[in-house]
């Protein structure tokens, strides 16, 4: 869907769950793509998190190429006080704003092609300018590699494992 929206000339916001603490229905690496009118595919957590994110997106809040947002927890970094997660849980999400003029659609096509052939890729995202590079990866261990304060986030995108009986 992200490729279609970009090809239609629409800006998209690609969101990736970076970390969770406590109760969370999605694990790190879960993704959602949205556009300015609030249309979206995928999920970050379910319910109130998506609702809050999409409300803020429609209001024009996410203007940077990439930013990490936090929901829940007791941290002062929680800029979403109206969203409380169960049992003191916390969720950190990478939000990437991508315009149709960027080379990002080519990266998405490459990613889709590799996934279709059973290969995994690592997306390396720079927080300062939102630059993204793709790298082959053999180890499918951690889906997200990021230390708070680091300017680089590595996200492993791999084909979904299937059990055939």
Region roles according to the model:
Residues 1-165:
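Segments forming oxygen-rich coordination pockets for charged ligands
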């Amino acid at each position: 869907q992200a490729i279609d929206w970009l090809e239609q000339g629409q800006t998209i916001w690609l969101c990736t769950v970076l970390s969770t603490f406590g109760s969370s229905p999605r694990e790190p690496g879960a993704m959602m793509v949205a556009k300015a009118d609030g249309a979206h595919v995928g999920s970050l957590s379910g319910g109130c998190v998506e609702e809050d994110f999409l409300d803020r997106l429609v209001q024009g809040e996410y203007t940077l190429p990439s930013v990490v947002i936090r929901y829940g927890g007791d941290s002062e970094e929680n800029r979403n006080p109206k969203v409380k997660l169960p049992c003191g849980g916390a969720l950190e999400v990478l939000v990437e704003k991508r315009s149709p003029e960027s080379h990002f659609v080519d990266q998405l096509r490459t990613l889709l092609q590799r996934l279709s052939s059973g290969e995994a890729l690592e997306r390396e995202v720079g927080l300062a300018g939102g630059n993204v590079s793709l790298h082959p990866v053999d180890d499918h261990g951690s889906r997200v590699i990021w230390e708070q304060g680091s300017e680089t986030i590595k996200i492993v995108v791999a084909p979904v494992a299937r059990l055939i009986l």
